[in-house]
Amino acid sequence: MDKEKTLLTLNSFNKNTLMETLKIEFVDVGVDFVTAKMPVNSAVHQPYGILHGGATAALAETVGSCASALFVDTKTKIIKGIELSVNHLKSKKEGTVFGIAKPIHKGRTTHLWEIKVVDENEQLISICKITNIVLDKK
């Protein structure tokens, strides 16, 4: 896997999407993980001035779905998230959070990923799981 080329490809998918709005950027990829970062500021706050759970969920779904896409032939297959769970463990007011997706199961038709959302000090903010379905392109 060409890491730099893969990161460029992943980041190219963000243009004109929610990921671009949230400033999500893929920053690392390996044989068994994908990492993306998102800034925490007023743009992703909820009314109490902390990171909105929906923004965290968007980061988790983004990194988990894109991780699945790395393991299929995207010329013939598409990935769709069918379940997302997010447990928020700690709040975050400002800085950066990182979504790190690691596989739990990579089957022929379904993938299950664990996504840990941590801050720049490696404090666990949220723990997430996403189930993706692998479908034939029509």
What is the meaning of each model-derived region?
Residues 1-138:
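Terminal targeting signals and extreme-terminal segments of soluble enzymes
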